[in-house]
A protein has these predicted regions:
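Acidic/His- and Gly-rich active-site-bordering loop/insert found
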Residues: 3-103
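Zn-dependent metallopeptidase/amidohydrolase metal-coordination segment
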Residues: 4, 9-12, 338-341, 345-360, ...
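Midchain, well-structured core segments that form catalytic/ion-binding scaffolds
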Residues: 23, 103-106, 146-147, 153-367
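Short secondary-structure junctions
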Residues: 40-46, 237-245, 292-296, 343, ...
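Active-site metal-coordination/substrate-binding segment of hydrolases
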Residues: 65-163, 189, 203, 327-337, ...
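His/Asp/Glu-rich mid-to-C-terminal helical/loop segments that flank catalytic regions of hydrolases
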Residues: 158, 223-241, 268-273, 320-327, ...
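Active-site-adjacent substrate-binding region
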Residues: 219, 226-228, 233-249, 403-446
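Substrate-recognition/cap regions that form aromatic- and gly/pro-loop-enriched pockets
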Residues: 343-432
Length: 487
């Protein structure tokens, strides 16, 4: 494990190093919540955990600066638990192994947790600082952002006192985000009675892996391969041409990550095994050709292996309905923003497919900066799975964050950034969910901007943070806090 705690600036890297030692996958935050409260107590920082599981910290103003506008620094404590297929890492018990790789910090075949651990570490650095001059400060460290922004959604509307919100969950240094997409989770489920497999049939497990995956908002415009959408094309042809039957399907494991792996178990007449192997080879070539220049095609694996024939499988009619619905379900970009053609407005990610043992569950995350198109796409997906006889539920819906280009804090941030770096910052809206939109719905008078150091490939085992961006990011935060104007 690389010693990252002595990287510059040590104030941030020392705290991030501590965070990597505390397991904090979404949905399992007890250890990190306890750690943050213990850390605050030891540092002499006022802190409490609210009913939503968020940690709130408060630091009084430097004497003489009590009249300054209050600043809320915000980041989320949870991380996406993604790992390479051969990794044995247990996100609920194991620390993250960090590696310094040139100008980057990465993990050992797992997500790093810089999204949004570096934001949390920055809040900690400000809170423990003894020489930073500032007005009244609050730190809001939210729970379960990655799985549905639950901490922000359940944030009490009277908990915070600040006037300005600095969100540290943007992943390109020099970009200052003032708008983001809304989102909605769509879950389609079906219980079915399995039928017996023909005792004379053979069985194969077909696996697709080695795709890039990635963030289903930020990277959806790159046209990366979705393992579930690739697999369904193969499965439909195997059923149609080789009398294959579906026994089980497992593809994807995170609602907000493009699935990079999927596997199915198929049964079929023994005499069709050789033809199935040929079909697998053909589809591997097709996928590599289709995604040449987008995926790292030499990493793509698509193969079949003989397995014990399962006793039960999906009934033929239900199988056909499920496969058709997955095939037809929209995935990827639906519409670009008319006013900003380089920005995705509306998209969806066919994130998770789980079929087997008499149950089917399919999960999609739809995003849009336009509320109408968000619900239009969600209803389109709902209609698709309704036709397959599935029960469809919407959850976790949140509005987008409408840009305010005349924001006072944006103007100040851009001024300080140019003073420090000699170049203009880029004002941006992102096709991803940021908690800013939800917090603004509860605190509508906040002036908000989001920024952070450069991260690459978040939500994947290739996640990494650029070391050289962290020092200028820290310098910007410190000067901003020192120069916040009076109320």
């Amino acid at each position: 494990m690389a010693d990252i705690k002595n990287l510059n600036p040590v104030e941030i890297w020392r705290n991030f190093d501590k965070l990597t030692q505390v397991p904090r996958p979404s949905g399992h935050l007890e250890k990190i919540q306890a750690y943050l409260l213990d850390w605050a107590k030891e540092a002499g920082v006022e802190a409490f955990q609210d009913p939503a599981g968020n940690i709130v910290m408060r630091k009084p103003a430097t004497p003489g600066m009590e009249n300054r506008k209050g600043v809320i620094m915000q980041a989320h404590m949870d991380m996406v638990p993604q790992k390479a297929p051969d990794s044995k890492h247990n996100f609920e018990t194991d620390p993250i192994e960090t590696i310094i790789d040139g100008d980057w910090v990465r993990a050992n075949h797992t997500t790093l947790g810089s999204d949004d651990g570096l934001g949390v570490a920055t809040i900690m650095a400000v809170m423990e600082s003894k020489d930073l001059q500032h007005g009244p400060i609050e730190g809001l460290i939210t729970a379960d952002e990655e799985t549905g922004m639950y901490g922000a959604n359940d944030l009490p509307a009277s908990e915070l006192n600040g006037d300005i919100l600095l969100n540290f969950d943007t992943e390109v240094w020099g970009e200052f985000v003032i708008g983001s997409a809304g989102g909605i989770d769509i879950t389609a489920t079906l219980d079915y009675k399995e039928v017996e497999t023909d005792k004379e049939d053979a069985a194969v497990k077909v696996t697709l892996k080695g795709l890039k995956g990635g963030h289903s908002g930020i990277e959806i415009n790159e046209g990366r391969a979705n393992a579930n959408k690739c697999m369904v094309r193969f499965v439909r042809e195997a059923i149609s041409e080789l009398d294959a039957r579906l026994a089980s399907w497992q593809g994807g494991n995170m609602r907000n990550a493009i699935p990079f792996q999927a596997e199915v178990v198929l049964t079929l007449p023994k005499e069709n095994i050789e033809a199935l192997n040929d079909l697998v080879a053909d589809w591997k070539d097709e996928i590599c050709d289709e995604f040449e220049g987008i995926e790292t095609t030499e990493n793509i694996e698509f193969f079949a292996e003989n397995v014990e024939t399962p006793k039960m499988q999906v009934p033929a009619e239900i199988q056909d309905n499920l496969v058709d619905a997955i095939y037809a379900c929209h995935d990827g970009v639906l519409r670009m923003a008319p006013s900003m053609p380089e920005i995705v407005e509306t998209s969806s990610n066919l994130a998770i497919v789980e079929i087997g043992d008499g149950k089917a569950a399919i999960k999609i995350l739809a995003r849009s900066s336009h509320e109408y198109y968000k619900m239009y796409l969600a209803t389109m997906v709902e209609s698709c799975f309704n036709m397959a006889g599935m029960k469809v539920e919407f959850s976790g819906s949140y509005m987008g964050w409408n840009p305010n280009p005349k924001s006072d804090i944006l103007e100040h941030v851009l001024k300080v950034y140019k003073e420090q770096n000699g170049t203009d910052g880029k004002v941006q809206a992102v096709h991803a969910g940021l908690e800013c939109s939800i917090i603004l719905s509860k605190y509508p008078n906040l002036d908000v901007v989001s920024f952070g150091p450069t991260l690459l490939s978040p939500h994947t085992a290739n996640e990494r943070c650029q070391i050289s961006c962290v020092a200028p990011f820290w310098n910007l935060v410190k000067q901003l806090l020192t120069e916040i104007p009076a109320k």
